[in-house]
Each structure stands twice: as C-alpha cells, then as structure tokens.
C-alpha cells in the first residue's frame, strides 16, 4: 500500500490436498481430517482421482469457506478477495452422474430430474459465490470480491467440469465485483486465440456493475502459448 499497490487475498476454495488422499498426512487440527474421522461429517470431504476436495454440496463446507474469507477481510488490510479457477473437478460421460457429490444430488429435490446434476452443481457454486460476496460486503463494503475463472468459456459451460455460471455472475451485482478470466494464450493459438477469446468475454458482460479484467500470465512470456516471438 505504501507503494500505491493494491493487495488481494487469493483463495482456492474446494481443494484440500492434491496428489494424495491420505488423511493422516494432514495436520490433526485440519478440519478436513476431523470431518473425515466423524461418520456424521465424513462426506464433507471427498476423495476423487487421487486428490481431496471439500464437498461443494454441503452447507458446512460453504460456511467454512465463507467464514475463511470473512476472517481475512476482518483481520488483514486487503483490498479484495480473489478466488482461483478451481471449482469442481473434471468428470466424464461414464461417471458424471455417479461420482463425487452425486449422492447429495440424488437426495435433493433436483435429483428427480434427468440430467439435473449439471444445474445442481452450478447451484452449489452459485450459493458459495453469492454468500462470499455478501459476507465481504457486510464486513467491509469497500473490499472487492472477484473470480479468476479459466479463460475458455466453452470449458466453463461444459457439463463435465467447473460448473460455474459465469453468465449469471457477469450480469448481476449479487455475485462478484469483477471477473478476471485467465486468458493465457497467444494470438496464434490454434483454437483459443487471445483476441477472439477476449472479445467473447467482453461480449458476455452486460452489467455495468461487474468489471472484466483480462488475466495475463507474465510467467508464460517466451513460452509456447501459440504466439509468435514478436507478440511475446
């Protein structure tokens, strides 16, 4: 701040551990481990493809993440809360309706509808995002809340991954103050050219209250991202 810079806290909401499902490797004080050891809360944490995740469909999980964001805003002089692009993991046609939080989906009122699991999962993410936004604004109205989703909109709207409703976020003041898509490709990328992807995001944003910032990865400069050397 003394140098005129804004500082935001970057959070990754659902991931507990990557590359391991061994709960004993977590601290004994880790809530994910405590939840796993209790039959009543065991499904608050899910193992999937070698990693551990908080279950997006559980209210206790949502409360934990919201309170974490609120704690940061209350105790640290940050200008914003910035959520990373990791939401639901990726499924496929054989397990999309049976893996991960499918049990919670089937037990919900939406579980009676064929293929409703996509809407169900998006609903869980929306509930979390809206709750974080409300908590941040209630704590310090001047602190912003934004999300940095993956850059390719088609991937975000897939029925197999993420389950983020970016169109709703971009056109409502109840979810985010800004969206910062990670457009980490060059102008010569074979299917995600920087200018085309950027224009698509700008076209999707219709609310004047939600800003769109383009996320550029400086660390990829000079690497093969589909850009010519002159464009790097």
What spans do the regions from the language model cover?
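Active-site-proximal loop/short-helix segments
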Residues: 16-29, 75-116
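The substrate-binding groove and active-site-proximal loops of carbohydrate-active enzymes
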Residues: 47-66, 111-125, 181-188, 220-227
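Acidic (Asp/Glu)-rich catalytic clusters
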Residues: 1-4, 170-174, 199-209
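Active-site-adjacent "subsite" loops/lids of carbohydrate-active enzymes
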Residues: 6-75
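Generic structural signal for well-ordered alpha-helices
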Residues: 1, 69-73, 125-134, 166-167, ...
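Substrate-binding cleft/loops of secretory-pathway carbohydrate-active enzymes
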Residues: 138-139, 144-180, 185-197, 224-225
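Aromatic-lined carbohydrate-recognition surfaces of secreted/lumenal glycan-active proteins
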Residues: 5-18, 82-89, 114-162, 209-221
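Surface-exposed substrate-engagement region within the catalytic domains
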Residues: 188-232
């Amino acid at each position: 701040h003394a140098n005129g810079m804004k500082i935001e806290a970057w959070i990754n909401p659902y991931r507990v551990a990557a590359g391991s499902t061994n709960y004993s490797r977590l601290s004994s004080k880790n809530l994910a481990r405590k939840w796993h050891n209790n039959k009543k809360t065991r499904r608050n944490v899910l193992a999937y493809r070698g990693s551990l995740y908080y279950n997006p469909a559980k209210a206790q999980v949502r409360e934990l993440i919201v309170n974490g964001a609120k704690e940061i805003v209350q105790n640290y002089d940050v200008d914003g809360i910035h959520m990373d692009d990791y939401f639901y993991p990726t499924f496929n046609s054989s397990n999309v309706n049976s893996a991960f939080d499918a049990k919670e989906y089937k037990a919900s009122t939406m579980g009676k509808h064929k293929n409703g699991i996509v809407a169900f999962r998006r609903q869980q993410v929306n509930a979390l995002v809206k709750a974080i936004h409300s908590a941040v604004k209630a704590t310090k109205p001047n602190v912003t809340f934004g999300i940095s989703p993956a850059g390719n909109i088609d991937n975000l709207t897939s029925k197999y991954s993420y389950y983020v409703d970016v169109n709703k976020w971009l056109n409502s003041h109840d979810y985010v103050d800004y969206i910062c898509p990670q457009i980490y490709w060059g102008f010569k990328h074979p299917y995600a050219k920087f200018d085309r992807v950027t224009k698509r995001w700008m076209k999707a944003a219709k609310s004047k209250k939600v800003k769109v910032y383009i996320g550029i990865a400086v660390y990829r400069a000079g690497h093969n991202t589909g850009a010519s050397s002159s464009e790097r």
